[in-house]
Amino acid sequence: MTLRQVLHLVRPHTLPASLAPVITALALAALDGFFRPTTAILTVLVGLLAQIISNIANDLFDFKKGADGKERKGFERPLSLGKVSYREVKNLLIITIIATVLTGIALILLSSPWLFIVGALVILGAIAYTGGPFPFAYHGLGEVMVFLFYGLVAGGGTYYIQCGTLSWEAIALASAMGFASCNILVVNNYRDVEEDTLSDKRTLFVRFGKSLAPKLYLANILLSVLLLFPFYSIIGMLSSGIYLAQMMHLQRTMLRTEGAQLNKVLVRTAQGVVLFAFNALIVIFVHYQWGTALGGLHHH
């Protein structure tokens, strides 16, 4: 297995978006006066590794179920193209799981034993997404899973590890990140509706029709911006407005785009999650630093 093939399996372009909820939660914790560098680094590592597990497991199980046909419109997957063997990919998955478990144990030892449950759920979730007896992605629950894992678990969990407690602000921020992240999957499943119908992958849009996708995309954008409400100041609103305009333009592009051309929208949506994280950082930072001076809501 060459490095290039490993990279295709790891899918580095998916990683910045998976880090977004972790980084924003770390920033919020730091502004609340809690920052532990060691646990912060370990949390970032667990976040990256969990995403890689999900990517590799996804390839493995989709291949096994025959969901990645030759007429695939998505990015190149070495396994379904016969460039790597099933065993090689399985071994890579096992190595990644071991690395994640070890990093996770270090994190649990440094913070709270409760995290063991969260960690087990993260690994199970990453695999159960396309594998196991009830693959979420095949039952129209992919978006819900993304919201839970990339929103509440990643954001809320990161904040809890730093602060030892949760705040409503942290939950609002984590949810905002979750809704923003959902759109990556929305575009992905919108693109794949035809193949998914054939391979019995009953995604939301296979179940309720393709026209739901752009509507859900828009709803996610609006919800993510609205959920930053605890932190808004005038500058924050301007920043979110710029983000909103860009994403709504992308949503209109999505409506006019078909098939493999949607990969561009997918990449730009993933970049949009990173952009939203930057926006959230600006919004939070301004709120904490200047608060009421800029017409923001009073911070307790």
Predicted segments, located by residue:
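Topogenic membrane-insertion module of multi-pass membrane proteins
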Residues: 1-42, 46, 133-134, 139
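Small-residue-rich segments of transmembrane alpha-helices in multi-pass membrane proteins
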Residues: 16-25, 144-159, 206-210, 267-280
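Membrane-embedded alpha-helical segments that form the functional core of polytopic membrane enzymes
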Residues: 22, 32-60, 116-124, 167-187
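Acidic (Asp/Glu-rich) catalytic motifs at the cytosolic membrane interface
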Residues: 49-73, 182-205
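Multi-pass membrane catalytic core of lipid/isoprenoid biosynthesis enzymes
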Residues: 70-113, 201-235, 271-274
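Intramembrane alpha-helical segments
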Residues: 77-165
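Functional transmembrane core segments of multi-pass inner-membrane proteins
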Residues: 146-193, 211-214, 293
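Extended hydrophobic alpha-helices typical of membrane-associated regions
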Residues: 233-293
